[in-house]
Amino acid sequence: MALLAAANLVPAASAAANQSLTKERATALFLENGKVADWLDRYPRAGRVSDATYEPDSSKCSAGTQGGCWNVTVTWKKNDKVDAGVIATGKVDDRTSRVTEAWTGPQVAWKMARGYEGAFGGRKINSLRYWLPFCFVFLLGLADFRRPLSLRNLDLVALLSFSVSLWFFNHGNIFTSVPLVYPPLVYLLARCVWIGVRGRPVRAARPLWKPAVLLAAAVFIIGFRIGLNLADSNVIDVGYAGVIGAQRISSGVMPYDNFPKEDELKACGPADSAGEIRDRIQFNGRCESANPLGDTYGPVAYEAYLPGYWIRGWSGKWDKLPAVHLTSIIFDVLCALGLGLAGLRFGGRWLGAALVFAWAAFPFTQYASMSNTNDMIVPVFLIFGFWLASSPWSRGVSVALSGLTKFAPLIVAPLWLTYPGPVRRPRPALAFAAGFVVATVLAFSILLLDGHPIQAAHTFYERTLKTQITRESPFSLWDWAQYHARGIPDLHIVQRVLEALLVLGALVVAFVPRTKTPLQLAALTGALLIGFELILTHWSWLYIPWFFPFVVFALLFGVREQPQASV
């Protein structure tokens, strides 16, 4: 026993002998870091606790570390009700005494808040040499060059201005990036409400480009987008969840609460740089990469990946995931096609071509496509439902399918139910309801795979709606109070008031104006979707494509191609 005890003490003694810094010195170096010190100034010293542990394995330290490192954490707690938890964490190089990592506030719990290069969409689309050309082409094709100070040009700039907040996000500056999202959201909301209430298109000069030119450019850009997706894009957890759900459904398993997890399951893969092993043997005997929270979306978010899964399959690992890339590309192209059809039907050749071009050239649609999320699936059903807006049945089906992908589009259900108004006969409303119910029943039929539908429905609620409602997130203004930091207000009450106003607004626009044109339907749909995003606790730049089709339709609808002179 004495020999065993001595053997266990040898590695610890060896590690201690190789340390250049003491625990106290490593902690002091971390606390003196400018970024850390600025954040800690927001907290009283009372209740603050610092700790540091030595890590001898350089592979678990920051890249480039030659020896060991110190993992330092700072927590703060005032009482049982006011507990900020870990408020700062990072690493100190033991040999160089350099702070190699310093994460504060939202960066502690959210790695996506740390500004890792290319974390969303890959490195190319996030680089200025790709992003700025998309912005330039978008303006070149749609701007009113005859009137540089026109309202239409301001609208286009507002759409592109989300780029500023995204730039700060990509550099890990959450407390700057998030507030910068709201001015363009509020502006576009106001513009959509104004157009939707007045029912008049935006006055604009004759377009610079012919429909054929815009359409040819759009086809070229779409081809370029597809190549860029295949060559340099990544798949985040959202897209990965889609193919997992498709595999579960194809195997006769309800996806909810059956996603790959780690827990204490047998490992079947290597550990990452943080020592975490994601690949585990799951309940089905397969070695799969964990994504335990991926079952938080509606059933359509998984059913939409079935064709891609059947064609390209899934290895079980979080690898290149070709089925996800295929699905993203298909829905990206479908969005462009649907917009073209809607524009052609309601506004003519120029509007149809312009909408396809707008979708193709807008950098945020490519950003979502190259992140390979399910955010292209959300608008596609509404786009085609809008194209077939004269059919109550089609409107009901489209709202249900979109809302059962991610739940936000359900906010437009009253508006689409009463379109075009006024409601005089029950038949159109019944047709809408029938389409909605049929689509809902078909979408939720996967709950029957469980064998206990009632329990499956409860599981669905627990994993989706309850999770979404109770989640915490720094990616909006509404939940920053969780940090209990000086100078950061608690806006939960404001959020609740805005939520009530949104619901009230959704009911009001269902009946006011009494009759609505396709332009008003598009504008008010865009307004409601923007309103929903304004009050979200967890917001992302990936959500911009939800409202973009309807906003850009409303903003470009007034442009008319000049008729050719008769000979």
Model-derived regions, located:
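Membrane-helix interface and helix-disruption motif detector
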Residues: 121-125, 145-153, 168-180
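Exposed beta-strand-loop-beta-strand "reactive/processing" segments of non-cytosolic proteins
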Residues: 40-95
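Short, non-transmembrane alpha-helical segments in secretory-pathway proteins
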Residues: 16-63, 122-130
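Transmembrane-embedded, aromatic-rich helix segments that form part
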Residues: 396-402, 408-419, 543-546
